[in-house]
Amino acid sequence: MIRVGIAGAAGYTAGELIRVLISHPQVELRYLQSESHRGESVGRVHRDLIYMNLKFSDLDLTDIDVLFLCMGHGMSAQFLERHPVPASVRIIDLSHDFRLKSNAGDFVYGLPELNRERIRGAWHVANPGCFATAIELGLLPLAKSGLPPAHVSVFGITGATGAGQKPTEETHYSHRAQNLSVYKVFSHQHLAEIREILAGQDEDVQADIAFVPVRGCHARGIMINAVFASERDLSEIRSMYAACYEGHPFTVMSDEPVYLKQVVNTNYCFVHVEQQDRNVLVTSVIDNLLKGASGQAVQNMNLMFGLEETAGLGLKASYF
């Protein structure tokens, strides 16, 4: 059994991670650390887990095989400075602290559809961001093709859980319900990793992306619509996408338009491509807390420990 510790275990991504791991056939949850809830029942914070006999506790880093860091951005690096982790313990970080090459050190970027083999041999993995996952999976086949578009316009809408557990004016029900709002236009923090990953596939790729993120009024799920011009015909583009994701169990090409409820509460990414004249539309949908965070973290753990990539991730979509 894989002995697991989670640091920062009280937030949304940690809650989803716990929910997935308690049903994982090869996992034993050893330590759930939360400085603000030390000694409390996990069910007092994650209210659907009141049936579990789990408590928040301090970590014993010598008694685990893998450490998940579910901490705020900037806090994972600080945690690792204060708490040296034994060399025998693998680390999966869900913050943005180690995603960019300038800060990565020996952390491997944890997008299995791109880095599956590197993840298999990794001891430290940086889990991608939620918007980054959806956009990269929507555009990666283009970057790999050698003929990427000169410019891509991306419109993305995300659920309220993408903002985290701490309430703010923008996440308050009276503001978010029955409302849409743009934010961080052309400057979202995930753009840096998106550009770096897409450009890394070909030295000629410029990764010119204009990204407009939108706060949705739903709880969870991301939809990305990417538009670009291409001289290729639709069948060629779809074939390119199918070839890129062949053998990757969680990224699925759809001939029909996709929608959020197909993937909410799952680790899947569904991708659909349409074309009219030279205009191409790529739509990708994911659950921001699963394929965009905790589910992908478990997928990476499975690869790191030589397990079936899908272990513990046979999750049911809500659908309706």
Which residues does each PLM region occupy?
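Short Gly/Pro-enriched turn/cap motifs at secondary-structure boundaries
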Residues: Y183-F186, V214-C217, Y259-V263
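C-terminal active-site/capping subdomain that shapes the small-molecule cofactor and substrate pocket
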Residues: V227-F320
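N-terminal Rossmann-like NAD(P) cofactor-binding subdomain of oxidoreductases
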Residues: M1-V185, D202-D204, E274-Q276, Y319
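Predominant activation on well-ordered alpha-helical scaffold segments within soluble catalytic domains
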Residues: I18, E136-A143, L191-R195, A242, ...
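Short, solvent-exposed beta-strand edge segments and adjacent coil->beta transition regions
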Residues: A122-V125, L180, G221-N225, L281
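C-terminal substrate-binding/catalytic lobe of Rossmann-fold NAD(P)-dependent dehydrogenases
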Residues: S187-M253
